[in-house]
Regions:
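Catalytic cores and adjacent flexible loops of soluble metabolic enzymes
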Residues: 1-303
Length: 303
Protein backbone atom coordinates (compact mmCIF):
# COMPACT_ATOMS: atom_id res chain seq x y z
CA UNK A 1 0.00 0.00 0.00
CA UNK A 2 1.29 3.45 -0.91
CA UNK A 3 -0.09 5.67 1.84
CA UNK A 4 0.56 9.18 3.16
CA UNK A 5 2.82 9.53 6.21
CA UNK A 6 0.38 11.69 8.16
CA UNK A 7 -3.39 12.17 8.47
CA UNK A 8 -5.45 14.89 10.15
CA UNK A 9 -8.39 13.74 12.25
CA UNK A 10 -11.28 16.18 12.72
CA UNK A 11 -13.30 15.20 15.78
CA UNK A 12 -17.04 15.67 15.26
CA UNK A 13 -18.31 13.75 18.29
CA UNK A 14 -19.39 16.73 20.42
CA UNK A 15 -21.65 17.88 17.56
CA UNK A 16 -22.44 15.01 15.19
CA UNK A 17 -22.09 12.40 17.92
CA UNK A 18 -24.35 14.01 20.50
CA UNK A 19 -27.02 15.60 18.30
CA UNK A 20 -29.27 12.50 18.26
CA UNK A 21 -28.64 11.16 21.75
CA UNK A 22 -31.80 10.98 23.83
CA UNK A 23 -29.86 11.59 27.02
CA UNK A 24 -28.66 15.18 27.14
CA UNK A 25 -25.09 15.62 28.35
CA UNK A 26 -24.60 18.61 30.67
CA UNK A 27 -22.54 21.62 29.61
CA UNK A 28 -19.74 20.98 32.11
CA UNK A 29 -19.46 17.35 30.99
CA UNK A 30 -19.28 18.41 27.33
CA UNK A 31 -16.51 20.86 28.19
CA UNK A 32 -14.63 18.17 30.13
CA UNK A 33 -15.03 15.70 27.25
CA UNK A 34 -13.70 18.22 24.72
CA UNK A 35 -10.75 18.87 27.04
CA UNK A 36 -10.01 15.12 27.21
CA UNK A 37 -10.15 14.94 23.40
CA UNK A 38 -7.70 17.80 22.93
CA UNK A 39 -5.41 16.40 25.65
CA UNK A 40 -5.32 13.19 23.58
CA UNK A 41 -3.85 15.23 20.72
CA UNK A 42 -6.88 16.08 18.58
CA UNK A 43 -6.15 19.43 16.96
CA UNK A 44 -9.65 20.03 15.54
CA UNK A 45 -12.95 19.68 17.39
CA UNK A 46 -16.41 20.49 16.10
CA UNK A 47 -17.76 21.71 19.43
CA UNK A 48 -21.46 22.17 18.71
CA UNK A 49 -24.07 23.54 16.32
CA UNK A 50 -25.76 26.94 16.47
CA UNK A 51 -29.02 25.45 15.29
CA UNK A 52 -32.37 26.34 16.89
CA UNK A 53 -32.67 24.43 20.21
CA UNK A 54 -36.14 23.25 19.19
CA UNK A 55 -34.62 21.18 16.37
CA UNK A 56 -31.63 19.79 18.25
CA UNK A 57 -32.26 20.01 22.03
CA UNK A 58 -29.04 18.08 22.77
CA UNK A 59 -27.01 21.06 21.49
CA UNK A 60 -29.12 23.86 22.98
CA UNK A 61 -26.16 24.94 25.16
CA UNK A 62 -23.77 25.66 22.25
CA UNK A 63 -22.99 29.20 23.46
CA UNK A 64 -22.40 28.05 27.04
CA UNK A 65 -20.06 25.26 25.93
CA UNK A 66 -17.98 27.71 23.91
CA UNK A 67 -17.84 30.29 26.69
CA UNK A 68 -16.76 27.70 29.29
CA UNK A 69 -14.03 26.10 27.16
CA UNK A 70 -10.43 26.73 28.16
CA UNK A 71 -9.10 26.99 24.65
CA UNK A 72 -5.79 25.56 23.55
CA UNK A 73 -4.20 27.91 20.96
CA UNK A 74 -3.07 24.85 18.96
CA UNK A 75 -6.63 23.54 18.57
CA UNK A 76 -9.30 24.66 16.10
CA UNK A 77 -12.71 24.90 17.81
CA UNK A 78 -15.35 24.83 15.07
CA UNK A 79 -19.15 25.05 15.01
CA UNK A 80 -21.85 24.07 12.56
CA UNK A 81 -23.84 27.09 11.39
CA UNK A 82 -27.17 26.58 9.58
CA UNK A 83 -28.25 30.19 8.95
CA UNK A 84 -27.75 33.91 9.62
CA UNK A 85 -28.98 33.69 13.21
CA UNK A 86 -26.59 30.81 13.91
CA UNK A 87 -23.73 32.76 12.35
CA UNK A 88 -24.34 35.74 14.64
CA UNK A 89 -24.31 33.44 17.67
CA UNK A 90 -21.08 31.84 16.41
CA UNK A 91 -19.45 35.26 16.00
CA UNK A 92 -20.41 36.19 19.58
CA UNK A 93 -18.52 33.11 20.80
CA UNK A 94 -15.55 33.84 18.53
CA UNK A 95 -15.52 30.35 17.01
CA UNK A 96 -12.31 29.53 15.15
CA UNK A 97 -14.05 28.06 12.13
CA UNK A 98 -17.54 28.05 10.63
CA UNK A 99 -18.93 24.83 9.17
CA UNK A 100 -21.79 24.91 6.66
CA UNK A 101 -23.72 22.02 5.22
CA UNK A 102 -26.07 20.78 2.53
CA UNK A 103 -26.97 17.51 0.89
CA UNK A 104 -26.13 16.24 -2.59
CA UNK A 105 -29.70 14.90 -2.71
CA UNK A 106 -32.70 17.20 -3.23
CA UNK A 107 -34.97 14.94 -1.16
CA UNK A 108 -32.58 14.69 1.80
CA UNK A 109 -31.95 18.43 1.65
CA UNK A 110 -35.70 19.07 1.83
CA UNK A 111 -36.11 16.61 4.69
CA UNK A 112 -33.06 17.82 6.62
CA UNK A 113 -33.20 21.62 6.23
CA UNK A 114 -36.43 22.22 4.28
CA UNK A 115 -34.62 23.86 1.38
CA UNK A 116 -33.77 22.97 -2.19
CA UNK A 117 -30.08 22.62 -3.07
CA UNK A 118 -30.22 25.97 -4.86
CA UNK A 119 -31.72 27.69 -1.80
CA UNK A 120 -29.19 26.04 0.51
CA UNK A 121 -26.29 27.20 -1.68
CA UNK A 122 -27.58 30.79 -1.56
CA UNK A 123 -27.58 30.71 2.27
CA UNK A 124 -24.10 29.15 2.31
CA UNK A 125 -22.74 31.79 -0.07
CA UNK A 126 -24.00 34.54 2.23
CA UNK A 127 -22.63 32.89 5.40
CA UNK A 128 -19.25 32.29 3.73
CA UNK A 129 -18.97 35.92 2.62
CA UNK A 130 -19.69 37.23 6.11
CA UNK A 131 -17.49 34.69 7.89
CA UNK A 132 -14.58 35.36 5.53
CA UNK A 133 -14.99 39.10 6.10
CA UNK A 134 -14.70 38.41 9.85
CA UNK A 135 -11.49 36.45 9.24
CA UNK A 136 -13.04 33.01 9.81
CA UNK A 137 -12.26 29.99 7.65
CA UNK A 138 -15.30 28.15 6.31
CA UNK A 139 -15.57 24.41 5.80
CA UNK A 140 -18.38 22.73 3.87
CA UNK A 141 -20.12 19.42 4.48
CA UNK A 142 -21.83 17.70 1.58
CA UNK A 143 -23.95 14.84 2.88
CA UNK A 144 -25.43 11.75 1.12
CA UNK A 145 -22.55 11.81 -1.40
CA UNK A 146 -22.52 8.01 -1.68
CA UNK A 147 -26.23 7.34 -1.33
CA UNK A 148 -29.49 8.82 -0.10
CA UNK A 149 -32.22 7.10 1.96
CA UNK A 150 -34.84 8.57 -0.40
CA UNK A 151 -33.15 8.72 -3.81
CA UNK A 152 -30.59 5.90 -3.72
CA UNK A 153 -27.38 6.52 -5.67
CA UNK A 154 -26.19 10.09 -6.22
CA UNK A 155 -24.21 10.92 -9.36
CA UNK A 156 -20.60 12.09 -9.03
CA UNK A 157 -21.50 14.90 -11.45
CA UNK A 158 -24.11 16.24 -9.02
CA UNK A 159 -21.52 16.16 -6.22
CA UNK A 160 -18.97 17.87 -8.47
CA UNK A 161 -21.40 20.71 -9.28
CA UNK A 162 -22.01 21.38 -5.59
CA UNK A 163 -18.28 21.25 -4.76
CA UNK A 164 -17.58 23.66 -7.59
CA UNK A 165 -20.04 26.17 -6.11
CA UNK A 166 -18.67 25.77 -2.58
CA UNK A 167 -15.06 26.29 -3.66
CA UNK A 168 -16.10 29.34 -5.70
CA UNK A 169 -17.48 30.92 -2.49
CA UNK A 170 -14.08 30.57 -0.81
CA UNK A 171 -14.73 27.43 1.23
CA UNK A 172 -11.30 25.91 1.86
CA UNK A 173 -12.29 22.26 2.36
CA UNK A 174 -15.27 20.10 1.49
CA UNK A 175 -16.04 17.09 3.64
CA UNK A 176 -17.69 14.36 1.55
CA UNK A 177 -20.24 12.62 3.75
CA UNK A 178 -21.48 9.05 3.59
CA UNK A 179 -24.44 9.99 5.77
CA UNK A 180 -26.16 6.60 5.82
CA UNK A 181 -23.02 4.50 5.66
CA UNK A 182 -23.69 2.81 2.31
CA UNK A 183 -20.36 3.59 0.62
CA UNK A 184 -17.98 0.84 -0.40
CA UNK A 185 -14.34 1.17 -1.56
CA UNK A 186 -15.26 0.79 -5.24
CA UNK A 187 -17.75 3.65 -4.96
CA UNK A 188 -15.21 5.80 -3.09
CA UNK A 189 -12.77 5.13 -5.92
CA UNK A 190 -15.35 6.16 -8.55
CA UNK A 191 -16.25 9.42 -6.79
CA UNK A 192 -12.62 10.37 -6.12
CA UNK A 193 -11.55 9.44 -9.68
CA UNK A 194 -14.16 11.92 -10.90
CA UNK A 195 -13.43 14.76 -8.45
CA UNK A 196 -9.63 14.54 -8.45
CA UNK A 197 -9.48 15.13 -12.21
CA UNK A 198 -10.55 18.68 -11.38
CA UNK A 199 -9.58 19.35 -7.77
CA UNK A 200 -6.67 18.58 -5.47
CA UNK A 201 -6.92 15.87 -2.80
CA UNK A 202 -6.01 18.51 -0.18
CA UNK A 203 -9.37 20.23 -0.82
CA UNK A 204 -11.34 17.27 0.54
CA UNK A 205 -12.00 15.45 3.77
CA UNK A 206 -13.95 12.20 4.08
CA UNK A 207 -16.79 11.69 6.54
CA UNK A 208 -17.75 8.02 6.76
CA UNK A 209 -20.48 6.35 8.78
CA UNK A 210 -20.15 2.70 9.72
CA UNK A 211 -23.67 1.35 9.12
CA UNK A 212 -22.45 -1.64 7.09
CA UNK A 213 -19.02 -1.89 8.72
CA UNK A 214 -17.16 -0.50 5.71
CA UNK A 215 -15.97 2.86 7.04
CA UNK A 216 -12.35 1.83 7.67
CA UNK A 217 -12.08 0.09 4.29
CA UNK A 218 -13.32 3.33 2.73
CA UNK A 219 -10.69 5.30 4.67
CA UNK A 220 -7.92 3.08 3.26
CA UNK A 221 -9.22 3.59 -0.27
CA UNK A 222 -9.31 7.37 0.32
CA UNK A 223 -5.74 7.32 1.64
CA UNK A 224 -4.64 5.59 -1.57
CA UNK A 225 -6.05 8.60 -3.45
CA UNK A 226 -4.03 11.02 -1.32
CA UNK A 227 -6.85 12.16 0.97
CA UNK A 228 -5.33 12.95 4.37
CA UNK A 229 -8.21 14.51 6.35
CA UNK A 230 -10.94 12.43 7.98
CA UNK A 231 -13.91 13.27 10.21
CA UNK A 232 -14.61 10.85 13.01
CA UNK A 233 -16.45 10.63 16.30
CA UNK A 234 -15.04 9.53 19.65
CA UNK A 235 -16.35 6.06 20.46
CA UNK A 236 -18.34 5.93 17.20
CA UNK A 237 -21.21 8.10 18.42
CA UNK A 238 -23.61 9.66 15.95
CA UNK A 239 -26.14 9.28 13.20
CA UNK A 240 -28.47 11.62 11.36
CA UNK A 241 -31.98 12.54 12.56
CA UNK A 242 -33.19 12.81 8.96
CA UNK A 243 -31.48 9.73 7.54
CA UNK A 244 -33.45 6.62 8.54
CA UNK A 245 -31.22 3.69 9.49
CA UNK A 246 -27.98 5.66 9.73
CA UNK A 247 -25.61 4.42 12.39
CA UNK A 248 -22.67 6.15 14.02
CA UNK A 249 -19.71 7.90 12.51
CA UNK A 250 -16.50 5.98 12.10
CA UNK A 251 -15.01 5.81 15.61
CA UNK A 252 -12.00 8.03 16.20
CA UNK A 253 -10.56 5.24 18.37
CA UNK A 254 -10.78 2.69 15.52
CA UNK A 255 -9.56 5.14 12.89
CA UNK A 256 -6.48 6.26 14.85
CA UNK A 257 -5.61 2.68 15.80
CA UNK A 258 -5.79 1.53 12.18
CA UNK A 259 -3.82 4.51 10.85
CA UNK A 260 -1.03 3.90 13.36
CA UNK A 261 -0.92 0.20 12.40
CA UNK A 262 -0.58 1.27 8.75
CA UNK A 263 2.31 3.59 9.61
CA UNK A 264 0.24 6.76 9.13
CA UNK A 265 0.94 9.19 11.98
CA UNK A 266 -1.72 11.36 13.65
CA UNK A 267 -0.06 12.85 16.78
CA UNK A 268 -2.93 11.35 18.79
CA UNK A 269 -2.32 9.34 21.97
CA UNK A 270 -4.48 6.20 21.75
CA UNK A 271 -4.60 5.59 25.48
CA UNK A 272 -5.73 9.13 26.27
CA UNK A 273 -8.30 8.86 23.49
CA UNK A 274 -9.76 5.74 25.12
CA UNK A 275 -10.14 7.73 28.34
CA UNK A 276 -12.21 10.30 26.45
CA UNK A 277 -14.42 7.46 25.12
CA UNK A 278 -14.72 5.99 28.59
CA UNK A 279 -15.79 9.39 29.96
CA UNK A 280 -18.56 9.99 27.40
CA UNK A 281 -19.80 6.40 27.68
CA UNK A 282 -20.23 6.88 31.43
CA UNK A 283 -22.19 10.12 30.88
CA UNK A 284 -24.51 8.65 28.23
CA UNK A 285 -24.84 5.29 29.97
CA UNK A 286 -24.64 3.39 26.68
CA UNK A 287 -22.22 0.90 25.11
CA UNK A 288 -20.12 2.69 22.51
CA UNK A 289 -19.85 0.96 19.11
CA UNK A 290 -16.07 1.48 18.78
CA UNK A 291 -14.33 -1.89 18.29
CA UNK A 292 -11.04 -0.72 19.77
CA UNK A 293 -12.78 0.75 22.80
CA UNK A 294 -14.72 -2.48 23.40
CA UNK A 295 -11.54 -4.53 23.07
CA UNK A 296 -9.49 -2.36 25.40
CA UNK A 297 -11.99 -0.74 27.78
CA UNK A 298 -11.34 -3.17 30.65
CA UNK A 299 -7.62 -2.60 30.31
CA UNK A 300 -8.18 1.18 30.39
CA UNK A 301 -10.57 1.06 33.33
CA UNK A 302 -8.33 -1.24 35.37
CA UNK A 303 -5.42 1.24 35.33
Amino acid sequence: LKLPNFAVIKEVGPRDGLQNEKKIVGTKDKVKWIQLLTEAGLSYVEVSSFVHPKWVPALADASDVFSELKRDPNVTYAALVPNQNGLERAFLQNVDEVNVFLSASESHNKSNINKSIKEALAVIEDITKQATFEGKKVRGYVSTVFGCPYEGDISATAVDEICNQLFSYGIYEVSLGDTIGVANPLQVEQVLEHLLKKYDASQFAMHFHNTYGMALANVVKSLEYGITTFDSSCGGLGGCPYAPGASGNVATDDLVHMLHKLGVQTNIDEEKLLRASQFIQSKLNIQLPSHVYRALQHKTISR
